[in-house]
Every structure is written in C-alpha cells, then in structure tokens.
Amino acid sequence: MAKIIFVKDEQNEFQAYDFLQNLIVEEPLMATLVFQGLLQLETAETRKLSTGKQILPDVHLIIGKSQAYSLQTTRIETTVDQPIQEMKAHFKDKNCRLIYFTAFSGDETYYCFVKGYFKDKNPFTDQMSSYREEVKRVFLRRIEAETSIGNSDYQFETLKNKALENEGIAHYLESFSASLGKYIFSKRMEKKWSQLDLALKSDLSPVIIGRLEAGDPDLTLRMYQKVCTVLGVKATFSVD
C-alpha cells in the first residue's frame, strides 16, 4: 500500500485537499471517478530502479463507450529527479486536474498532492503552467514542506469518509463492479503490467481495460471473468 498525503502550497494552504473537499459537494459525479482513481493509487507503489528512474503506476479509467467520463494519470516532468505527475478527470465539458509528486521513506511510497484546479478553456487565464511550476518549486523544497501527516483535519482517510457521506458516491465506490475494478488494477500492478500488456494478453482493447478497471457497470461479467483469468485469479460469479 502507498500513502496519499497533502502538502502545503506556497500560500501555506493544503489547497489540493480543499479542492477535493469542494469537488465532493459541488461536482459529486466527477468526484466519484477521482476517488476511484485515488483509491487505486493507494494500492500502487512506485518502483524505484537503481538508476534512480521511477516506474510509475498508470491509472486510466473510462466509463461509457463515448469516453466522455474518464480519468488518467500522466507524468508532466520527465527528469529523473523531478517525479511530478498530474491526475486528469474529464466529465462532459469539465476537466479537473490534481498535481502531485512522489516521495519515499524507506520502503514506503507517498503520493504528495499539492494543487487541484479546473482547466480553463481560455489559454490566457488558465493557471496550468503556473501551478505546475509552483509544484516543482514545492518539490525542490520538500524537506522544508509542511505535510498533512499527523494532522487529522487533512488526512486522506478523513476526506474519503466525507466522500462516502454522499450516497451517490458511496453507491458507486462500494458497488460490486467498482470493487472488482480496483481488484483487477491491484493484480495488474502486482504483475508489473501496463494496461496495454493486459489488453494484449486478454485480447481486449486498452479502452475496455480502462472501463473494466473503472468498474463500468455496462460491461458484461464475461469480460471481467476473462481479465481475471489472464491475471491468474479464479473468478466465479453467481446471481442470487
């Protein structure tokens, strides 16, 4: 298990935490997929090679054939010494992003979230570049940075509980298909496979793998069984 924590930005605020808290209230549908992604990230430790290169988990979730409801993690800083990433969630005409970096303490992986924002369609007012640069500066000064560790008001577990107070979010995250999607993701991580690896081995498209890991309820049980078989998991489903 990895740990999700929050780090204060240059305004001395746990801005990413506050953003997620507002997202739960104001955009619960988008928050649902974001939390599915965060819960998967918790199960995925980043592997660090002797060269210093990090093998980062790829989280790519899709719900529906149109791919209008999706989430993806991408690396926005490619240098070895700056492992800065972004989690992008897209729902209809809205696009929100969370910027974070990876840190290590012994064998523990920490995903440190600093900034959250909605992507502005106007390039002249969009804050993406300035937020990314700010997170890079926070990362470079991370030894001095104040984190949410030990602060019960800003723990990921606290935020998760707030999300589950929303019946719609709880209904999805605790559903059979979403739980199975998280399990498929964790087994793929254990095997150190990418989504493309799993797609090739299961003879399914990468889009279908993204939908399975998201727990898309519109997919058939047969597809879930097929992927579980490839992952070496015996899955028997029955209807009461």
PLM region spans:
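DNA major-groove recognition helix of helix-turn-helix/homeodomain DNA-binding modules
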Residues: 220-238
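Flexible coil/turn residues that form the inter-helical turn or adjacent wing/linker of helix-turn-helix
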Residues: 180, 191-192, 205, 220
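Recognition helix of helix-turn-helix/homeodomain-like DNA-binding domains
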Residues: 203-218
